[in-house]
Swiss-Prot record:
PA2 catalyzes the calcium-dependent hydrolysis of the 2-acyl groups in 3-sn-phosphoglycerides. Does not exhibit detectable activity toward sn-2-arachidonoyl- or linoleoyl-phosphatidylcholine or -phosphatidylethanolamine. It comes from Homo sapiens (Human). It is found in: Secreted; Cytoplasm. PANTHER family: GROUP XII SECRETORY PHOSPHOLIPASE A2 FAMILY MEMBER, GROUP XIIA SECRETORY PHOSPHOLIPASE A2. SUPFAM superfamilies: Phospholipase A2, PLA2. The gene is PLA2G12A. Pfam families: PLA2G12 (PF06951). Its EC number is 3.1.1.4. Belongs to the phospholipase A2 family. Residues 1-22 form the signal peptide. This is Group XIIA secretory phospholipase A2. Ca(2+) binds at G88, P90, F92, D111. The lineage of its organism: Eukaryota, Metazoa, Chordata, Craniata, Vertebrata.
Length: 189
């Protein structure tokens, strides 16, 4: 059996130590990468669940904008509301150009209401329903035709139901943009 010289033995031991260190590093890197992948996956699930909660009515099902510390939100300094978009929702890629100016006016007022810090979704939706139903009453007075009123009421009901069932996320997003909470920074929308 050949004996290695002292320098060769030292070199061999250094090489073996380097190999062991590389293997440990590879295991550590894989372990860290696995944890990072798991963390990113959990974060994505959390993001999707929060979006679903916003869409379906918020945490309590009531669709209310609240500060996490329980304080009342206040208007964001210098906030400029976005221009109203008529009847539609960019969230769902829907824009309804119905061609009835008074209907578009109701939708625009509703958008502005959602962007008024501290205004409840319920109050905005009730004002919207009143505005829409007034259009149908005016159609009845002007035309006196029942079939036009029924078509108007069907359109109003469809719009209002859409707002009630799908309007939570747009409301919460508008409140987040228009309001500020003490001790909180604005988060990305």
């Amino acid at each position: 059996m050949a004996l290695l010289s002292r320098p060769a033995l030292t070199l061999l031991l250094l090489l073996m130590a380097a190999v062991v260190r590389c293997q440990e590093q590879a295991q550590t890197t894989d372990w860290r990468a696995t944890l990072k992948t798991i963390r990113n996956g959990v974060h994505k699930i959390d993001t999707y669940l929060n979006a679903a909660l916003d869409l379906l009515g918020g945490e309590d099902g009531l669709c209310q904008y609240k500060c996490s510390d329980g304080s009342k939100p206040f208007p964001r300094y210098g906030y400029k509301p976005s221009p109203p978009n008529g009847c539609g929702s960019p969230l769902f890629g829907v824009h309804l150009n119905i061609g009835i100016p008074s209907l578009t006016k109701c939708c625009n007022q509703h958008d502005r209401c959602y962007e008024t810090c501290g205004k409840s979704k319920n109050d905005c939706d009730e004002e919207f329903q009143y505005c829409l139903s007034k259009i149908c009453r005016d159609v009845q007075k002007t035309l006196g035709l029942t079939q036009h009123v029924q078509a108007c009421e069907t359109t109003v009901e469809l719009l209002f139901d859409s707002v009630i069932h799908l309007g939570c996320k747009p409301y919460l997003d508008s409140q987040r943009a228009a309001c500020r909470c003490h001790y909180e920074e604005k988060t990305d929308l």
